[in-house]
Amino acid sequence: MTEVPWVEKYRPRKLSEIVNQEKALEQVRAWVEAWLHGNPPKKKALLLAGPPGVGKTTTVYALANEYGFEVIELNASDERTYEKIERYVQAAYTMDILGKRRKLIFLDEADNIEPSGAREIAKLIDKARNPIIMSANHYWEVPREIRNKAQIVEYKRLTQRDIIKALVRILKREGLEVPKEVLYEIAKRANGDLRAAVNDLQTVVTGGVEDAVEVLAYRDTEKSVFQALAQLFATDNAKRAKLAVLGVDMMPNELLQWIDENVPYVYYRPEDIARAYEALSRADIYLGRAQRTGNYGLWKYATDMMTAGVAVAGIKKKGFVKIYPPKTIKLLTESKEERSLRDSVIKKIMSEMHMAKLEAIETLRYLRVIFENNPDLAAHFVVFLDLSEKEVEFITGDKEKAKTIWAKSMNIEKKLKKEGELEARAKEAERRVEAAEEEETMEAGEPEEELEEVEEEELTEEELEEAEEEIETVGKKEKPEKEKTKKGKQATLFDFLKK
């Protein structure tokens, strides 16, 4: 029996082979043929939206096979920066001029595109000379700048009947038989995901139909990598360790990074840690060979080494072990809400502490340590930076600690508010005293003005005439003296000294 994954071996090569998506495929054909006839559609991008495992990626490659396109695939969760995306797209344009085959640009996981890159990708769509197809689980999570420029084609979730038919066709081509109840159980657990169902079918056949119930018991399409690793590290049984990761929708190289990150938290003896990393090293070698040679049958051996090999490496720590995401891909796995909270905290640090962005990012790392170890000091930072409760939880990474810090910050704010109210009252009292003193001063000054006015009113006409005559007499005496001074010789410094 071949080791090639059945999802690749039996991937449809024609659009007509895709399971129960006729309406969606009709729209896709019309859109592509408009490009081929030299009349590109008004919306130059196509957005395929629907649940996992319904045929979105398969549509792209079947389309390329039928119409002779060369696919240039990008993954939004891996190539998030605009510079990388632009480099690939510009390369596609260049190859279009020099090469003979037309290019089809495929952007997978478009709902994971960074907002900063979305605007630039929208510009690339505007000037596109080749068809651009994107895929997403939820079209409303695709950035608006891109979504508005794309024709949306919705794929429906497959029924259990659809999945069973597809599984039966594969079994016939393999010359195998599986009990109906097992097929029904696979279809039920797949929850509309044909890719997951095919993987389960191959696992059941490889492990033996008699173990099908045990194998399927581990299958959970919604299982997170945290749950899978918790099961993996909790057992020292090789078979259970391999079954633990069946429900994780993740490539082997990604899973390797997760396991690699958590080995030191699970094992405490140096020799056990060394054995675990030796198993991971062998897994990495198999993955590298599979990538270079295209022999993806090596994935099975890589998975065995990174699961069973690690699980039986030695004695594990007792009690609960927290699972940590890999540092190298942590930023890529953050949810949109987490990225938004992170950016918000960084902006507040930049504003309140007058820092550049890189300094603020570095400061955030120190804040995490403070929030982890010193709730009292952390509470003061919450007030100083005006952090929200969600931002506190983001920095802390622990809901219980976040609640404690938030409660302390509320007490500080109440205290500051009370002090502020007292200060405001004191200032108001001071203002009132000053106003009262000013009013008293004004009232004391009014009689003097009245007195002056009375004195001016008491002058008689005779006194006014005498004053005028006196002014005229003084003026006549001063005038000749001024004229005499003008006619005299100009005094010099020598004359002044002679005197």
Curated annotation (Swiss-Prot):
Keywords: ATP-binding, DNA replication, Nucleotide-binding. Gene3D superfamilies: 1.10.8.60, P-loop containing nucleotide triphosphate hydrolases. Residues 428-499 are annotated as: Disordered. Residues 473-484 have a biased composition (Basic and acidic residues). Residues 436-472 have a biased composition (Acidic residues). SUPFAM superfamilies: P-loop containing nucleoside triphosphate hydrolases. GO terms for biological process: DNA replication. It holds the Pfam family RCF1-5-like_lid. ATP binds at G50, P51, P52, G53, V54, G55, K56, T57. One of its GO terms (molecular function) is ATP binding. Heteromultimer composed of small subunits (RfcS) and large subunits (RfcL). PANTHER family: CHROMOSOME TRANSMISSION FIDELITY FACTOR 18, REPLICATION FACTOR C SUBUNIT 1. Belongs to the activator 1 small subunits family. RfcL subfamily. Part of the RFC clamp loader complex which loads the PCNA sliding clamp onto DNA. This is Replication factor C large subunit. The lineage of its organism: Archaea, Methanobacteriati, Methanobacteriota, Thermococci, Thermococcales.
